[in-house]
A protein has these predicted regions:
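Class I S-adenosyl-L-methionine-dependent methyltransferase catalytic core
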Residues: 1-185
Length: 185
């Protein structure tokens, strides 16, 4: 697994062996950032001013990709200690710890906001229905700026229902995954 673009392009990321995570595939991340960079639907670009949330962070690949491409700050949230250690290791390897906050928390109970995000990545376990719960919790606890964009990765045939205060901007198939783009209003 590697960073696809930006400052740390081609740098490898640690993925723990045997750990129960499903990192977003390189090809899917490449497609995701291409969509974000080349579509007029996304007011969070350029990334230079963006505060990014990487929810269900796993290895931290989505937030790290955003930092590599110029995001101001990234907050990584996961409820698994091994995932948190992996994110911290990857941040240290890339010398990016000063631009990140890493929190061992349940995404459906994130606690009070420590940053107000303009871009949110959610890559929950497939078929878990956790994305909707996490988005609702992020709204209730003040984590999202009005107009924030949330990208949810699901299995190709999985459906999500945008929570109240979110509207579906678009959805795209990427191999066995589906990317859902939701706007918070």
């Amino acid at each position: 697994m590697r960073i696809i673009g930006g400052l740390w392009r081609r740098r490898r990321l640690l993925v723990p062996a045997g750990h129960d995570i499903r990192p977003t595939a390189d090809r899917t991340r490449e497609s995701l950032f291409s969509i974000l960079e080349n579509s007029g639907n996304y007011a969070c670009w350029p990334l230079a001013a963006a505060t990014v949330l990487d929810i269900f962070a796993g290895t931290g690949a989505l937030g790290l990709e955003a930092l590599s491409r110029g995001a101001k700050q990234a907050v990584f949230i996961d409820d698994n200690a091994t995932s948190i250690a992996t994110v911290n290791h990857n941040l240290e390897t890339l010398e990016a710890a000063e631009r990140a906050i890493v929190l061992l928390r349940d995404a459906t109970q994130p606690g009070p906001s420590v940053a107000s995000a303009t871009l949110v990545f959610l890559d929950p376990p497939y078929r878990s229905e956790l994305a909707e719960k996490a988005l609702t919790a992020l709204v209730k606890t003040g984590w999202l700026n009005p107009g924030a964009l949330a990208m949810v990765e699901t299995e190709e045939k999985e459906l999500i229902i945008p929570p109240r205060k979110f509207t579906l901007v678009e959805k795209r198939n990427c191999g066995n995954a589906k990317l859902w783009f939701l706007r918070y209003f």
